[in-house]
């Protein structure tokens, strides 16, 4: 499996992709691209995406390719998201092993999912995106590897890991007023995300950390 991380437009990536493919000889490629083209030029580069997919299969005809759309921010990216599934389907209909990954289905919260720069994802946002990648790819990857065991959930449950204990925001093994205070300070932006355990702070498992989680934790503490 090859993963190349590089900021750039579709033409910039296309100018390097042949070398990357020949150097790394991947079985699987994850392609998440085109957002920079839209932001830099204001135009949807559908033709560029289509040509890049063809270029990948020309160099590596037997590769398995996953092509993703974008989380719905900024608003302009939605017009690009609208054309990606059709391009992928066209290639699949032509016999290419290409699959669409719908990252736009993220339960998006701009307040928690976007980083300080107002554009890229925060740790919370990337965690959500990683779970969607997992959801759309795991069964196909297992089939490629010849595995048949059931697909596990992308999000751990309290029985999966001793670190998962809802309300234990500071990971001290207890759920008490210290966790409530820390969670409240995070909501008020007194401390940053590195000060809390995101999984344990998301009390209702909706992918967001907000006043609702504060209320749930408060009710739990009052019952205790």
Curated annotation (Swiss-Prot):
<dbReference type="InterPro" id="IPR036514">
    <property type="entry name" value="SGNH_hydro_sf"/>
</dbReference>
<feature type="region of interest" description="Disordered">
    <location>
        <begin position="147"/>
        <end position="168"/>
    </location>
</feature>
<dbReference type="GO" id="GO:0030245">
    <property type="term" value="P:cellulose catabolic process"/>
</dbReference>
<protein>
    <recommendedName>
        <fullName>Putative endoglucanase X</fullName>
        <ecNumber>3.2.1.4</ecNumber>
    </recommendedName>
</protein>
<dbReference type="InterPro" id="IPR002105">
    <property type="entry name" value="Dockerin_1_rpt"/>
</dbReference>
<dbReference type="InterPro" id="IPR016134">
    <property type="entry name" value="Dockerin_dom"/>
</dbReference>
<keyword id="KW-0624">Polysaccharide degradation</keyword>
<keyword id="KW-0326">Glycosidase</keyword>
<dbReference type="Pfam" id="PF13472">
    <property type="entry name" value="Lipase_GDSL_2"/>
</dbReference>
<keyword id="KW-0378">Hydrolase</keyword>
<dbReference type="Pfam" id="PF00404">
    <property type="entry name" value="Dockerin_1"/>
</dbReference>
<dbReference type="InterPro" id="IPR018247">
    <property type="entry name" value="EF_Hand_1_Ca_BS"/>
</dbReference>
<dbReference type="InterPro" id="IPR051532">
    <property type="entry name" value="Ester_Hydrolysis_Enzymes"/>
</dbReference>
<dbReference type="InterPro" id="IPR036439">
    <property type="entry name" value="Dockerin_dom_sf"/>
</dbReference>
<feature type="domain" description="Dockerin">
    <location>
        <begin position="162"/>
        <end position="224"/>
    </location>
</feature>
<keyword id="KW-0119">Carbohydrate metabolism</keyword>
<keyword id="KW-0136">Cellulose degradation</keyword>
<dbReference type="GO" id="GO:0004622">
    <property type="term" value="F:lysophospholipase activity"/>
</dbReference>
<dbReference type="InterPro" id="IPR013830">
    <property type="entry name" value="SGNH_hydro"/>
</dbReference>
<comment type="function">
    <text>This enzyme catalyzes the endohydrolysis of 1,4-beta-glucosidic linkages in cellulose, lichenin and cereal beta-D-glucans.</text>
</comment>
<dbReference type="GO" id="GO:0008810">
    <property type="term" value="F:cellulase activity"/>
</dbReference>
